[in-house]
Amino acid sequence: MGKWWFNSIEGLEHRCGLSKSMDSLGYLIGNTSGSEDPTLNDTNKNIPSWGHSGSYSCNNVDHFFSVRDIWSFISDGTFLVRDNNGNCYSVYLDIENQVFEIDNDSSFLSELESSFSSYMNSSYLNSGSKSDNRYYDRYTYDIKYSWNNHINSCIDSYLRSEINIDSYISSGSDNYRDSYIYSYICSGESVSNSKSGSSSIRTGGNSSDFNRRGRSNDFDLNKKYRHLWVQCENCYGLNYKKFVSFKMHICEQCGYHLKMSSSERIELSIDSGTWDPMDEDMVSMDPIQFHSEEEPYRDRIDSYQRKTGLTEAVQTGIGQLNGIPVAIGVMDFQFMGGSMGSVVGEKITRLIEYATNRSLPVIMVCASGGARMQEGSLSLMQMAKISSASYDYQLNKKLFYVSILTSPTTGGVTASFGMLGDIIIAEPNAYIAFAGKRVIEQTLNKTVPDGSQAAEYSFHKGLFDPIVPRNPLKGVLNELFRLHGFFPLNQNSSRALGSVICSEL
């Protein structure tokens, strides 16, 4: 295996408009024929030349199969090409680590060609139509979309995302979404039309298309790029991870509200520097000694604690919302599906009792699959315990409780404190139900209509009050609190409240 390193300043300056030169960067993938500025350090191998011309033409390299279907192999990071002498090469391109590898393993390539020949007699080939693939005309032997242009487009997209992304944010440009990296990291459209475990190869004309379809579901991003992108569950579009938080985890393509962690919701709602958590050291102790065949309950709790950095499926504490002191609890669906066990119930109950004693408004952000089955009837008792504390808070003390329902809110949470708010707010398109769709269909053997458990449907049936997107949510809460007589503290009152909280926690 030969390995070469490549750098990229000239193409970077040309594409991203950088005025400051970086000495550590050179040309984009280019001259391998030993000219003045070789970018590949090892030139002992006789590799077909990819000239460093203005058009980055690649006329002496043929497609072994089309660019569109290459993205089915993105996990391997490998391109397959053949030169005009009939020699086949596998090309590995790792933009992040600046690695460019070429191999001519004849055994692997001959095995692949045998797969082509065996597939030519298959029924799929006879029934397949080139017109069914809308990428066929664009990516098959098209000089405009040659191999070099494709690779340079990949590098373009990476450079934009890593180096020049601030200019896209400030200008509000959406051009980065047109890049190859953005469009084809996840072969969403081709995968969605395939069944898991099947494989197919399509050949015809002057080119060959190779499709390997074996992904378990349409939502899986390749592991190699999950640190860069967040995929929308609604439109399958990709959102750049570095600034998805600035967009409040709202999909830029369709406006769908993506899932958020409890820490992200606290950061969104609570003023910076005012958050004081409560009962952080409270953890579950496996009260009924529940052991499944897969893993013990305690081991599962430990794994979720390491994964999320949380001790339980809810965070509770005191903070300020536009200067107004509030008691807030935020459930986290990433921790065992936000399930409600004895610790979750105890933390919420203590939060409400503290707010009752301090006459603070309460916000509960719900995201849960319901009661935690690993704790049996003890988890069901939390419904009554929280409801009892809420009754004293709302009816006896006449204080103000706001419930925010996010996706999903189901089971025991829906049947208890989730629906007890003086004002019940739902996020757009939130999944809100008591029993889930799959449970209903398997129990009653009836089909649940699509959208019947969405927030918009429940809103028209009068199940809750407003549907509020994340963008204006903090302002809406601020107006509600002022309407009910809760106002921002002055600096002296704020310091006094902070000292009282610290002394009691």
Curated annotation (Swiss-Prot):
Q: Does the record's keyword annotation contain Protein transport? A: no
A Gene Ontology annotation in the biological process aspect, one of them, is: malonyl-CoA biosynthetic process
- Compositional bias per record (Low complexity), positions renumbered to this chain: 189-205
User: Gene Ontology cellular component?
Assistant: acetyl-CoA carboxylase complex; chloroplast stroma
The GO molecular function terms of this record are: acetyl-CoA carboxylase activity; ATP binding; carboxyl- or carbamoyltransferase activity; zinc ion binding
Q: Where is this region: Disordered?
A: 189-213
Q: Where are the zinc fingers (C4-type)?
A: 232-254
Q: Cite the entry's keywords alphabetically.
A: ATP-binding, Chloroplast, Fatty acid biosynthesis, Fatty acid metabolism, Lipid biosynthesis, Lipid metabolism, Metal-binding, Nucleotide-binding, Plastid, Transferase, Zinc, Zinc-finger
Q: Which reaction does it catalyse?
A: N(6)-carboxybiotinyl-L-lysyl-[protein] + acetyl-CoA = N(6)-biotinyl-L-lysyl-[protein] + malonyl-CoA
Query: Its pathway?
Result: Lipid metabolism; malonyl-CoA biosynthesis; malonyl-CoA from acetyl-CoA: step 1/1
Per the UniProt entry, the Enzyme Commission number(s) are 2.1.3.15
> What Pfam families does the record point to?
Carboxyl_trans
Cofactor note as given: Binds 1 zinc ion per subunit.
Q: Which InterPro entries match?
A: AcCoA_carboxyl_beta, Acetyl_CoA_COase_Trfase_b_su, ClpP/crotonase-like_dom_sf, COA_CT_N
Where does it localize? Plastid, Chloroplast stroma
Description of how the protein assembles with itself and partners: Acetyl-CoA carboxylase is a heterohexamer composed of biotin carboxyl carrier protein, biotin carboxylase and 2 subunits each of ACCase subunit alpha and ACCase plastid-coded subunit beta (accD).
The UniProt entry, under HAMAP family, shows: AcetylCoA_CT_beta
- Which named protein is this? Acetyl-coenzyme A carboxylase carboxyl transferase subunit beta, chloroplastic
Q: Which organism is it from?
A: Calycanthus floridus var. glaucus (Eastern sweetshrub)
Where is the organism placed in the taxonomic lineage, from the top?
Eukaryota, Viridiplantae, Streptophyta, Embryophyta, Tracheophyta
